[in-house]
């Protein structure tokens, strides 16, 4: 891909009850189907948790950059992202939804919403999902 500044590779085997790992084995994680989906659940992760973790960290980084560009250093951004696996009636399969809850300190609700929207436009995960999954933004200023 043109203009790549970073890439990473993950390999999976065994589907939802298998494992995912990097070729150099610096990341190795067992997977388990959640009980809600008929699986064993347990302490292992699943694709939705991995997606939520990546999206949350990326969104928080984008928001922190926006805040820094606006010379705001005391907002202490917290980003909580819930990824839902939803039934897709168009093909009797599944689709994803995302609920993004952001808390910012020491600013007005209006400013918090403005900065979160800017981060949502800038975040690579938000760009990748825009128009593809339902996303709900919930912003709280404290």
Swiss-Prot record:
Return one Gene Ontology term, BP aspect.
response to oxidative stress
Can you tell which superkingdom this protein's organism belongs to?
Bacteria
Q: Which InterPro entries match?
A: KH_dom-like_a/b (IPR015946), OHR (IPR019953), OsmC/Ohr_fam (IPR003718), OsmC/Ohrsf (IPR036102)
Question: SUPFAM superfamilies, from UniProt?
Answer: OsmC-like
A Pfam family this protein belongs to? OsmC
Q: Which family does it belong to?
A: Belongs to the OsmC/Ohr family.
Provide the protein name.
Answer: Organic hydroperoxide resistance protein-like 2
